[in-house]
């Protein structure tokens, strides 16, 4: 395998310096036309938020059982310039290849969701006036956040009309949203969408169908305080 792109990942409490044990994003295709094992990108987690190193992998499997779009995860031993960095969790990147596996198409727009701390707030507070550009396009075509704006407008209209479910069901996969919220509760995912509107993606089908949610970064699952 040739040269690859590497950068540190993480924010707030999860970021660590290179001399510690950081998380990484790997771009396997950045400098060479290569796709080892069919992959273009891969995320590596050091398990800094999870000493057991099990939550990401178990969370991915349980999300799949709940029919919630999420990445697959496994384990690897990492060496950097010959130095053993120990056990890492490998996480499937959510890119066009992942879209093809999960949604049966590599088309459509995939955004990284904006972080909107929302404990005790109404859900979907991440969609609203002035918030559309907080969503970062990961895959697809730049449409000036028009697809995000459609959900934001429906959210505002639904609250004003008192018809949240009926209005949002036209632009959001509501059964999928319910599965997402139930799975976050079931798994005690205190760092996920269902609790603090964090660590999620949204995907818009190319045919203009309703938006789908997907989970990301599941090392905050299975927390005992949430499961009691």
Where are these predicted regions, by residue range?
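Residues that flank catalytic or metal-binding motifs in active/ligand-binding sites
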Residues: 2, 20-22, 38-40, 72-74, ...
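Active-site acidic catalytic loop and adjacent metal/ATP-binding pocket
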Residues: 26, 170-225
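Short, well-structured beta-strand/strand-turn elements
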Residues: 66-79, 192-193
């Amino acid at each position: 395998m040739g040269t690859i792109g590497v950068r540190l990942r993480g924010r707030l409490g999860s970021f660590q310096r290179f001399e510690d044990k950081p998380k990484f994003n790997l771009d396997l295709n950045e400098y060479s036309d290569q796709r080892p094992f069919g992959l273009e990108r891969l995320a590596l987690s050091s398990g800094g938020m999870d000493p057991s190193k099990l939550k990401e992998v178990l969370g991915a499997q349980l999300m799949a059982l709940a029919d919630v779009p999420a990445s697959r995860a496994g384990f690897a031993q990492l060496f950097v310039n010959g130095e053993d960095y120990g056990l890492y969790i490998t996480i499937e990147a959510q890119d066009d290849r992942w879209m093809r596996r999960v949604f049966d198409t590599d088309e459509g727009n995939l955004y990284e969701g904006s972080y909107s701390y929302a404990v005790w707030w109404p859900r979907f507070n991440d969609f609203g006036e002035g918030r559309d550009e907080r969503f970062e396009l990961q895959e697809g075509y730049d449409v000036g956040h028009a697809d995000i704006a459609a959900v934001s407008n429906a959210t505002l209209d639904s609250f004003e009309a008192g018809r949240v479910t009926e209005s949002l069901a036209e632009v959001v996969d509501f059964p999928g949203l319910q599965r997402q919220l139930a799975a976050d509760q079931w798994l005690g995912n205190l760092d996920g969408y269902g609790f603090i509107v964090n660590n999620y993606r949204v995907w818009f089908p190319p045919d203009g169908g309703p938006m789908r949610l997907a989970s990301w970064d599941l090392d905050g699952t299975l927390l005992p305080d949430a499961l009691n």
